[in-house]
Amino acid sequence: VRIIEQDKRAYMNYCTFSYSARWWDWERWEREIDYMAMRGINMPLSIVGYEAVLFYTLRDLGYTDDGALNFISGPAYLPWQLMGNLDSYFSLTDKAYVDKRLELGKKIIDRELELGMTPIQQGCSGQVPSTILRVLPHTNAYNVPSWCGFPVTYQIDPLDKNFRKFGMALLEKQRQLFGAHHYYACDPFHENKPPIKGDKYLQNVGKAISEMYTAFDSQAVWVMQAWSLREPIVKA
C-alpha cells in the first residue's frame, strides 16, 4: 500500500515533452501513464496534440493551412512556444502530422481519465501570430522581447477585446478536441520581460486571463510554473 499525503500530484513539465517524450508513440505513452498510476500521479501535464488546437483555431479565424502551420513550431521547439518563448520556429509543413498528433493526444487523455487522473491542459496567455491583424483588424498587439536570441513574439493587449476572443477560441477548440478538465497552464512572459513596464500592466494581464478562464469554465484553475511567477499577475 502506498500512502501519499498530497491531494494534487502533478507530473512532467513543458521541457519534458521535447527533451524526453517528443518521439514517444502510443505504446510508450501507455507505459508511462500506467507508471504514473502506479506511483500515485493524478495531475499530468497533457499537451500532446495541441498542434491541432492551434491549427484548427487559426483555420476558423481565416488562416490558410500553410498560414496556420507556419505559426506552429516544429517538434523540438513546440513546448517553448506553449510557454510563450517563441513561435514559428522550424514550422510545421504537413497537416497529416497535426492530425496524427491529435489522435495520439486523445488516446493519452482518455487513458489518463480512465485511471482517475485530471489532465492539466494548455491555457492561453495572449500570444498570437505576427499576422494576427489580417484576421482580427484593429487588434492592439505588442512585440515581446526576444528570448535567448529567438525572434520576437507577439502579445495581445489584455485590455483589447480580441484578447478574450482569441483565447476563448483556443479554449473552445481544445474542448471540442480533448474535452475541458478544469486545470489550464500558462506562464505569461516566462523567462522574459513584459512588453510594458510596471505592475499595472501585469495586473491587467492576470485579471484578463483569470476572467477569461472563469468565463469559459466556472471550475477553472490556473496552473503556473513556480520559478516564473510574477506576483502582480498571481494576485490580480
Regions found by a protein language model. Give the residues of each.
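Aromatic-lined carbohydrate-binding surfaces of glycoside hydrolases
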Residues: 3-236
